[in-house]
From Swiss-Prot:
Signal peptide segment: none
GO molecular function: glutamate-1-semialdehyde 2,1-aminomutase activity; pyridoxal phosphate binding; transaminase activity
Designated name of the protein: Glutamate-1-semialdehyde 2,1-aminomutase 2
Catalytic activity: (S)-4-amino-5-oxopentanoate = 5-aminolevulinate
Modified residues (N6-(pyridoxal phosphate)lysine): 268
């Protein structure tokens, strides 16, 4: 059995210093009935805690580290940039370079604006949609998390799902009234909402692959149906690709599924592990943003050279072949864990999209938030503890997906399968 004594002591101190002892709720490990594990360093596919325990890491800082921890090229480039200055409050050439790369790879993006977080990206995209259309309402989907902006904390997923909060105190009723929420993968509900409110719907925001109720891909025709309805009613289609961007495919989820939105929100991978966000889209829409247009948005550290450099170095190392390797690794992981779970009578369902993996403790297909909630959370908590003790670091929430990196090896996958086999054997007794 591993020792977590230093982590326990650090958490005890942290609880006196920060709300709940953490700076983001899911890190509190509440849904797995554990104290948080405090990390110290990472290299490649491995992460090490302050007690000296080593783990194969499938959290990867919640997605950004698609090359693994402390990638040599990323680290060296950051050292060089930091020596010249971490931020200037002025434009730099590296902003142009990352913007050109994003525009080249993301089908919907003709112009892009950099910000400092995914939440900033989605909040700004909603303001732009409202300003561009002159309408008020936003349609979103149950269990889809788009950051902690007031308009979007209505039946959100992710940590909100883990805590069992359908929304958050502090969100004014007037704001909530302008957010319409319908089930994911349910076009009929979308059609009903448009028939009722269509003239005042500014935009539809959706994760093209839901990543905050576990991993839930779109059913065939769902994204195209959204594209058709938004065009019919004059609303904007907004893809929140903060998580899926450059994780599902070389050209993001929109490239993989062949559906082009009006606006796209990005984050995580495009910062290479540093705080970042971006939103972009059609030029005529994006030109409404200040200083080109009247819709205001700004940020002190937007486009800072550290985040831009880390993002640029990360994206430059990704190739179409990288995503073929993700499929091979994912196939091996799914086949091995499914076989082990079945052998011990463990209910399970896998959902996958590129380098994103959802593993649910239910035999039912998981196509929306209601189905995701059917997963056995007590069984997940037992599995989580067992895997941590076996040296596998997973997201401490059933409603978060696993992430693969280019640094993960087939040996890592095999060791993960062997660990799962032993844990399933133990928890099935």
């Amino acid at each position: 059995m591993r020792s977590y004594e230093k982590s326990k002591a650090a958490f005890k101190e942290a609880q006196k210093l920060m709300p709940g002892g953490v700076n983001s709720p899911v890190r509190a490990f509440k849904s797995v009935d554990m104290d948080p594990i405090f990390m110290q360093r990472g290299k490649g596919s491995k992460i090490f805690d302050i007690d000296g325990n080593e783990y194969i890491d499938y959290v990867l800082s919640w997605g950004p580290l698609i090359l693994g921890h402390t990638n040599d090229r990323v680290v060296e480039s950051l050292k060089k940039v930091a020596e010249n200055g971490t931020s200037f409050g002025a434009s730099t050439e590296v902003e142009n370079e990352l913007a050109k790369l994003v525009i080249d790879r993301v089908p919907s993006v003709e112009i892009v604006r950099m910000v400092s977080s995914g939440t900033e990206a989605t909040m700004s995209a909603l303001r732009l949609a409202r300003g561009y259309t002159g309408r008020n309402k936003i349609l979103k989907f149950e269990g889809c998390y788009h950051g902690h902006g007031d308009s979007l904390l209505i039946k959100a997923g992710s940590g909100v799902a883990t805590l069992g909060l359908p929304d958050s105190p502090g969100v004014p009723e007037g704001i909530a009234m302008n957010t319409i929420t319908v089930p994911y993968n349910d076009l009929e509900s979308v059609a009903l909402a448009f028939r009722e409110y269509g003239e005042d719907i500014a935009g539809v925001i959706v994760e093209p692959v839901a990543g905050n109720m576990g991993v839930v891909p779109p059913q065939e025709g769902f994204l195209q149906g959204l594209r058709d309805m938004t065009e019919q009613y004059g609303a904007l289609l907004i893809f929140d690709e903060v998580m899926t961007g450059f994780r599902v495919d070389y050209n993001c989820a929109q490239g993989y599924f062949g559906v082009t939105p009006d606006l796209t929100c990005l984050g995580k991978v495009i910062g290479g592990g540093l705080p970042v966000g971006a939103y972009g889209g059609k030029a005529d829409i994006m030109e409404r943003i200040a200083p080109s247009g009247p819709i205001y948005q700004a940020g002190t550290l937007s486009g800072n050279p550290l985040a831009m450099t880390a993002g640029l170095e990360t994206l430059q190392q990704l190739t179409p072949e990288s995503y073929q390797e993700f499929v091979k690794k994912g196939d091996m992981l799914e086949e091995g864990i499914s076989k082990a779970a079945a052998a011990h009578g463990i209910p399970h369902t896998f959902n996958r999209a590129g380098s994103m993996i959802g593993f649910f403790f239910t035999n039912e297909p998981v196509i929306n938030y209601e189905a995701a909630k059917s997963s056995d959370l007590k069984l997940f908590a037992k599995y989580y503890k067992g895997m941590a003790d076996a040296g596998v670091f997973l997201p401490p929430s059933q409603f978060e997906g696993l992430f693969l990196s280019t640094a993960h090896t087939m040996e890592d996958i095999e060791n993960t399968i062997q660990a799962a086999e032993k844990v399933f054997q133990a928890i099935s007794r």
